[in-house]
Amino acid sequence: MIANDEYPDMIYAKGSATDLYQAGALIDMTDLIEKYGPNIKKMYGAEMEKLKWSQDDPGIYQLSYAGVNQKTLTTGGSCQIQWAALKENDYKYPKTLDEYEKMIKSYLAAHPKTEDGLDMIGITMSASDWHWMITLGNPAGLIADASPDNGQWIIDDEYNVHYKHVTDEEKEYFKWLCRMYNEGILDPNFATQTDDDYIAKVASGRVVAITDAEWHYSQCEATLVADGKVDQTYVGLPVTLREDQVEKALLYQGTTVGWGIGITKSCEDPVRAIKFLDYLCSDEGQILYHWGIEGENYFLDDDGQPYRTDEEVAKAQSDPDYAKNTGIDNYTGFPIYGTGSYSEDGFPYTPTTKESVIANYNTAEKEGCEAMGFEMLTDMFAQPEEFDLLPYSALWAYQQPQELAEKQTILDEIAWPGLVKCVTGTEDEFDGNWESMVQELTDNGLADAEEAMTEFLATKLVDVE
């Protein structure tokens, strides 16, 4: 496409936005939005600043694909444990790694085998492929550094960027994993099993605890519920390394930017294109996209609130072609309001609301909420309003220059096997293995990568006052 210098009117670039920008393929939509985009401006509000390409070029070349004003209504937290284990602990959920360990060991001691006679597993992971970032790498940042998810990086209060797998806190966390491995709590196959093996193992109900992302382990929970093993599903936890840290699962980092829809220089009528995008951002456009057609896909109750019939909900959940046939949530890449957001007159933009999430809790979740005195499971976490709004979006989502991405890849290719070696070695070998990994990272551009990433982030900082 770039080689031929020929483009469609609009393009959802995903990871190729930088290439298109550098080729001059995307037009700056700033003036078009100012003249023809009142709904675009309303949707993004103060976060319009984050749509700007950089401080050097404040043009807007994409509208973000991610939900604006997204509310986190469910979360896996920093790690997870089976509801059965939490129930046996009188629903006193762990907040520190030490408490997490004690709960896992206590449940294993009381239940060494499954009803089928298989050995229970304390913790397992999927670390033989790219999922190592999800189950081995990311939890280290969430638990040890108490950092929000910025990919392989942590950002300090001065907006300096650091590669996370060299911090003192992560050293302590991986030393803990090493001990769990040598004590037989961590699955000996955690770094060699395939992701399919991992999914099957977790879905069997044998694994007491996991350190995973909700989107990844949710497929296991669907199987567990179908098999009548609801108590073996998982509760997300606000676990951190130390008591003085605050887990940040609910911290709102603002609209995720980096991927989105843009208008190309080949578009003969960019005014028409921006008007189309503006319509999609309107209340009418958003309700049509998320809910469908009134009287067909949804109805209004006596209070003017939308609802879907049980038949429609079942169809949406079971028909693989539902989105394609109805158009509801089918065309990804366009700007949308996030779950849990409402119009000015109180109309929920999406069917996923606080009320719908609570209504869909399984029996273990409902019993847990009642026992802990929570309305929602997210009530056990620090709430969004407790955090300051950050002047940057999630770092992993930005379109980074190729040379910067290559620097990270070099570090990751060292850290992945290095961390596995740290965990699977003996406890006496840990310090030496850790120091060896850090030295290899240092010798392969660690400081240069951190400096380059810090400089990159500096171009993305916006005023949030």
Protein language model features and the residues they cover:
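Bilobed periplasmic-binding protein-like "clamshell/Venus-flytrap" ligand-binding domains
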Residues: 109-126, 287-290, 443-454
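Structural recognition of the beta-strand scaffold that forms the well-ordered cores
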Residues: 9-13, 28, 61-65, 78-80, ...
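Short, solvent-exposed loop/beta-turn-alpha elements that line the ligand-binding surface or hinge
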Residues: 28-46, 92, 144-168, 242-250, ...
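Periplasmic solute-binding protein
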Residues: 17-24, 30, 49-93, 127-166, ...
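Conserved small-residue motifs centered on glycine
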Residues: 285-418
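Histidine-centered catalytic/metal-binding microenvironments
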Residues: 417-465
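Extracytoplasmic "Venus flytrap"/periplasmic binding protein-like
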Residues: 1-55, 84-95, 112-115, 130-132, ...
